[in-house]
UniProtKB/Swiss-Prot annotation:
The gene coding this protein: coaD
Site label Transition state stabilizer, positions: H18
Organism: Oceanobacillus iheyensis (strain DSM 14371 / CIP 107618 / JCM 11309 / KCTC 3954 / HTE831)
Family: Belongs to the bacterial CoaD family.
Protein name (database record): Phosphopantetheine adenylyltransferase
Pathway(s) where this gene product acts: Cofactor biosynthesis; coenzyme A biosynthesis; CoA from (R)-pantothenate: step 4/5
GO biological process: coenzyme A biosynthetic process
An annotated GO cellular component: cytoplasm
UniProt keywords, alphabetically: ATP-binding, Coenzyme A biosynthesis, Cytoplasm, Magnesium, Nucleotide-binding, Nucleotidyltransferase, Transferase
Length: 161
């Protein structure tokens, strides 16, 4: 497929499910920019700067992936970066309805940029950042659910180090 894709999200924090989608996107596109966007409907645990650092630590082994952040509309950001596509991960059918609404609006804003949906691997179909934060908050075992830098950061955030 080639070219440039944007992989947007709040990544609060990045999970192994996110990492799965990012890695697979990097196998399809020449370049992937993982972009941290603030979701106004969520109260983040990690600052944008912390999320960028965690992403960079988690994806440094993938040479064609970089990390950025934006507070603009996704389609404006994608146009500015000259992206050809947006990669969105889906865990289950329930994600599709929400993502379809966003995609329809994004098409209205810029019909030249395609949205590609990737189903996460089955082992991550239950995984969400919210769930990981809840488990970590009560000192539960999150190994295998998040990259190692995230596991350490969550333990530090909840004072379990």
């Amino acid at each position: 497929m080639g070219k440039l894709a944007i992989c947007p999200g709040s990544f609060d924090p990045i999970t192994n499910g996110h990492l799965d989608i990012i890695q697979r996107g990097a196998n399809v596109f020449e370049e992937v920019i993982v972009t941290v966007f603030n979701n106004q409907s969520k109260s983040p645990l990690f600052s944008v700067t912390e999320r960028i650092e965690l992403l960079e630590d988690s994806i440094k082994h993938i040479p064609n992936v970089s990390v950025d952040s934006s507070s603009r509309l996704l389609m404006d950001y994608a146009r500015e970066k000259k992206a050809h596509a947006v990669i969105r991960g889906l865990r289950a059918v329930s994600d599709f309805e929400y993502e379809m609404q966003i995609t329809s609006m994004n098409r209205k804003l810029n019909e030249d940029i395609e949205t590609l949906f990737m189903m996460t691997n089955n082992q991550y179909s239950f995984l969400s950042s919210s769930m990981v934060k809840e488990i970590a908050k009560y000192d539960g075992n999150i190994s295998g659910l998040v990259p190692e830098p995230v596991e350490k950061a969550l333990k530090a955030k909840f004072n379990y180090l």
